[in-house]
Amino acid sequence: MILKASQRGGGQDLAAHLMRMDDNEHLSVHELRGFASENLRDAFREVEAISQGTKCRQYLFSLSLSPPERARVPVADFEAAIERIEERLGLEGQPRAIVFHEKEGRRHAHCVWSRID
């Protein structure tokens, strides 16, 4: 699995990027955990609003998980990898969003956590 991660602000730009259908054949918001909102844009707005009361400017931790080119990875394997990564990074229980994209028949995942306690 190829992992790319970054701390970042700009939640609305990230939400727009993750919801782009012109770049992906299929898109699925798989999970929104710990948010009052029921959609990705509003969930990231929540985190941004909370961050305004702190000094934190990079209030999101974004991770993409891409399997090797020919691998067909089931959703459960992505979920297990995300759980292990979350534990290692100390992000257990933090609000998170998981989005799946499929591009040219290949599934990959994005997981975004709030860094604000």
Enumerate the language-model features and the residues they cover.
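N-terminal nicking endonuclease/strand-transfer module with a His-rich metal-binding environment
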Residues: 1-117
